[in-house]
């Protein structure tokens, strides 16, 4: 089948048909995802393997996190009681993470279709920000402490944990942010060493003996 016929079939079949195109296809079909109110704006931040999109859109009194799907369009995920929320990443299970204003601060959240928006709390400081999530709904991000910002990992079973504290021998590194997590639990993070240098770091989980 030629690229031209692929393109024609894609246009005729709509967005879902286009998603089945091979990666080397040379044509694209543009789809306007809209906004939460007609005269507003929308900003995407994350994309799943199923082409579900997360981000935020102005909703009248502030920006609200959204999830967009080909089947359901754009859905407002609400807030944590403050004026704003921002969707930042989406996992393979459809869980969305980001952060939202809450009681004068900003807190990391996770949203699921079953549980809605959940405040992940902090590590004793004012703010926290979720930046990545995997299919098991393990969340990574950054949270304030009394001594500065640190990277965290969160799970429903264990809550929010300081990533540096989970490394038996960090070798002088302090994890300042968890930025992504894959299905094997491997975390990509940003850290600072005792000389003040900031590096990209990879954290590989070790099974308990």
Short names for language-model regions:
Residues 9-20:
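Bacterial N-terminal signal peptides
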Residues 4, 21-209:
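Residue-level hotspots at or immediately adjacent to binding/recognition sites across diverse folds
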Residues 1-11:
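Bacterial N-terminal signal peptides that target proteins for export
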């Amino acid at each position: 089948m030629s690229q031209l016929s692929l393109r024609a079939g894609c246009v005729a079949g709509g967005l879902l048909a286009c998603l089945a195109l091979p990666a080397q296809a040379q044509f694209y079909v543009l789809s306007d995802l809209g906004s939460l109110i007609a005269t507003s704006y929308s900003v995407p931040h994350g994309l799943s393997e199923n082409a579900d999109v997360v981000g935020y859109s102005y909703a009248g009194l502030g920006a609200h996190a959204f999830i967009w799907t080909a089947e359901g369009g754009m859905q407002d995920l609400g807030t944590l009681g403050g004026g704003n929320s921002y969707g930042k990443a989406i996992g393979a299970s459809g869980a969305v993470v980001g952060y939202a204003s809450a009681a004068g601060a900003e807190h990391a959240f996770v949203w699921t279709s079953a549980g809605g928006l959940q405040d992940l709390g902090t590590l004793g400081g004012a703010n926290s920000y979720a930046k990545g999530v995997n299919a098991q709904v393990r969340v990574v991000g950054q949270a304030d402490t009394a001594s500065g910002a640190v990277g965290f990992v969160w799970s429903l079973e264990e809550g929010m944990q300081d990533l540096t504290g989970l490394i038996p021998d960090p070798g002088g590194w302090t994890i300042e942010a968890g930025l992504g997590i894959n299905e094997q639990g491997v975390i990509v993070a940003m850290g600072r060493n005792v000389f003040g240098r900031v590096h990209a770091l990879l954290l590989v989980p070790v099974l308990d003996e």
